[in-house]
Amino acid sequence: LRPYIIVAFATVALPVMFWEGFCVRAADATVEVIPSQAPQSFANPQLLYSFSGHAGTIKSLAFSPDSNVLVSGGAENEGVIRLWNTKTGKRVGTIRKAQKTAVESLLISPDGKTLVSCGNDNTINLWNLKKNYFTRSFVGHTSNILSLAVSPDSKVLVSGALDGIRMWDLLQQRPLATLVRFDNAIFTLAISPDGQMLASGDNKGVIKLWDLSTGKLIRGFTAHSNTVSAVVFTPDGKTLVSGSRDRTIKLWNLNSGEVSKTLTGHDNWVNAIAINPDGQTLASAGRDGIKLWNLTTGELIKTLYGHSDWVSAIAFSPDGQMLASGGFDKKVQVWRSQ
């Protein structure tokens, strides 16, 4: 284990934020229903909205804690973040130049106070959502920042990049530590529901588990034969779910460290995964749409077709009633349970 290394932060050019709104409605979409006897928590989803406004691929999505606002980040040199009201279907905010090029990842802190974004300009940017202003940039990474995670108490922010993993104090807005330097490229991060464990997935198919309070590596293991594109903890904290470019999704028992289930069904890379807050439904995204799985049985329940190209990002709302998706077709779609 390398020792903690303190890094620096700086404030950079102020991104532009303004608030606006227009009404959008759902585009054509289909739902393929696979006969199943398994119970469904996210039952009979229907397309509620289809948002247009980005100039490139949607790389990241996040809901506010009250599920009333959806935030989307655009890639391909767009660097724009857009905010959408999920009750009215209106766009209510835009942050131009949120990142100099692509917005690789974004999140809203669990307390709802802070929006965080990162990109391949090596910076992390913070906004105060209560007062609608830019607050600070964290600078310390020397390469593309690909992933973000925040602790349940909104105190610790973790960032993953081509040069490793760094930790930041989100409340005091200062750097905390560097866990790994110049390791494999960190594509995805997740923090356990109790805030004690950090999971990272890299471009070599390796997953590592860290003690978030000490920064010590608990264990690492080769999980997939290709890049780990997404990791997420189940709400009970007992299982880690990983998705990969090897086309598989795996469920890992955190007590034994063994695979409890392997889910197959995507015809290409698994780009993103998300778990409904009740822990019953897993969503996965790829070239062939969005697949909904019964997390207990591993059974494929439904496939949602709404995007005309790869689906690159998905997120469940905290109230468990909506699933948002973003794709290479530059659209953001919101599905609602009926």
Go through each PLM region and give its residues.
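WD40-repeat beta-propeller superdomains and closely related acidic/aromatic-rich repeat-like regions
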Residues: 3-338
